[in-house]
């Protein structure tokens, strides 16, 4: 049996080869680390259940950095989103927030500092082990998630099974599974 390749495919492959595009490196311009973190932050809220079936609407950040600017950029392009970005003067003045993102310099004393129903997220090493809920961890040029399900449960939050399948989970005992 003989396989036939459509003429359109042959012409396309020939055009790519002749123009030199086929010889270009496979790597395309990618996303920056702040853009990836911003995408995680804006999509993370869809995989977490808040107390009383409320829908998360507010992302609070402790400083205006590259990740904050990327979150703002994502939110400004989404027509269907009702998400709001609030840049805090300090963590002591926490307005009603559904998600609080902290950079690695501002995570000290996270345990018990925040209100029930606030998802805490940071990129500091050991954040989830210290009582934070979601930690961004850099692993081999990728951003991995570490989730402390015990801290989430104490705050009345529940991560979806789809989110947990993508993450390293730290239960209440503090050991990874």
Residue ranges and their predicted role:
Residues 2-8, 12, 20-177:
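Short hydrophobic alpha-helices and adjacent helix-cap/hinge residues
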């Amino acid at each position: 049996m003989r396989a036939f390749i459509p003429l359109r495919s042959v012409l396309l492959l020939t055009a790519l080869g002749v123009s030199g595009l086929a010889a270009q490196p496979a790597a395309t311009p990618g996303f920056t680390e702040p853009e990836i973190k911003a995408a995680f932050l804006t999509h993370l809220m869809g995989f977490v259940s808040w107390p009383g079936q409320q829908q998360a609407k507010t992302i609070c950040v402790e400083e205006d950095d590259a990740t904050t600017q990327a979150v703002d950029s994502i939110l400004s392009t989404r027509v269907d989103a009702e998400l709001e970005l609030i840049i805090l003067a300090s963590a002591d003045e926490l307005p009603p927030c559904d998600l609080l993102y902290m950079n690695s310099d501002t995570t000290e004393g996270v345990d018990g500092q925040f209100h029930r129903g606030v998802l805490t997220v940071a990129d500091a090493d050991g954040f989830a082990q210290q009582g934070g809920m979601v930690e961004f961890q850099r692993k081999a040029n990728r951003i991995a998630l570490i989730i402390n399900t015990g801290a989430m449960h104490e705050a009345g939050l529940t991560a979806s099974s789809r989110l947990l399948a993508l993450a390293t989970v730290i239960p209440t005992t503090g050991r990874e599974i």
